[in-house]
Regions:
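Structured loop/turn residues at beta-strand edges in well-structured enzyme cores
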Residues: 1, 57, 143
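Asp-based phosphoryl-transfer active-site loop
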Residues: 2-19, 44
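Short, basic/glycine-rich phosphate-binding loops at helix/coil junctions
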Residues: 7-10, 69-72, 139-141, 170-171
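Flexible loop residues that form catalytic
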Residues: 11, 67, 153
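Short, flexible loop segments at the rims of nucleotide/cofactor-binding pockets, characterized by
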Residues: 17-20, 40-41, 80-81, 125-128
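Active-site phosphate-binding/coordination module
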Residues: 24-118
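Conserved acidic, metal-coordinating active-site core of Asp-based
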Residues: 98-101, 105-191
């Protein structure tokens, strides 16, 4: 039997940047889709543990962290592509050199090396708590990190990423970008 599925993004698609909620009409439509034996799969840059706004949606699986962490709704892992330590260490050096804030997304949460107005504004934009400042090297070593976040403009991003051939970048905001293992993206997660 052929499986049918729909794939949906979260921020700016299911969840409005204005209301920070999923419209009731979308919830009802997706409940009908699910009742028709069509799988609902969330494809997002967010972590699997950061989907509280979607509790009423009967999704089946999540392609989280831009394809780096694919899990069933109950948390059963399907695949996970972690940032290699050598690449993380290089990004950490570049963050210090260029002076941009750096966040890591691990199985223990999101942590930043510094708070600045951009970090605070982006947390507000997606209605998240501001990530705590931590020793991100220690947090990286003590957890499973599948995504980094660099808080810089596109010009600096190009300069930084030219020095990181093992990583790739995706951007949905002019002052922030997600960084994953090269070749990892939502399309790979779908496959």
């Amino acid at each position: 039997m052929e499986t049918k599925a729909i794939f949906l993004d979260v921020d700016g698609t299911l969840v409005s940047f204005d209301t920070h909620r999923v419209p009731q009409s979308a919830i009802e439509a997706l409940q009908q889709v699910h009742e028709s034996d069509i799988k609902i799969i969330i494809a997002t840059g967010r972590a699997f543990t950061d989907l509280h706004e979607l509790e009423e949606i009967p999704y089946d699986a999540v392609i989280a962290l831009n394809g780096s962490d694919c899990v069933l709704r109950d948390g059963t892992p399907i695949s996970r592509k972690q940032i290699p330590e050598k690449d993380f260490q290089r990004v950490l050096v570049l963050a210090q050199h260029y002076g941009f804030a750096l966040a890591i997304e691990t199985n223990k949460g999101i942590f930043v090396n510094e708070l600045n107005p951009t970090v605070i504004e982006l947390a507000r934009l997606v209605n998240h708590p501001t990530p705590p400042v931590a020793d991100i090297e220690k947090e990286f070593m003590g957890g499973e990190c599948c995504q980094l976040c660099i808080y810089c403009d596109e010009e600096m991003e190009k300069e930084v990423m030219a020095q990181l051939p093992g990583l790739s970048v995706s951007r949905w905001n002019p002052f922030f970008a997600d960084v994953n293992v090269a070749g990892v993206n939502k399309a790979m997660g779908i496959n």
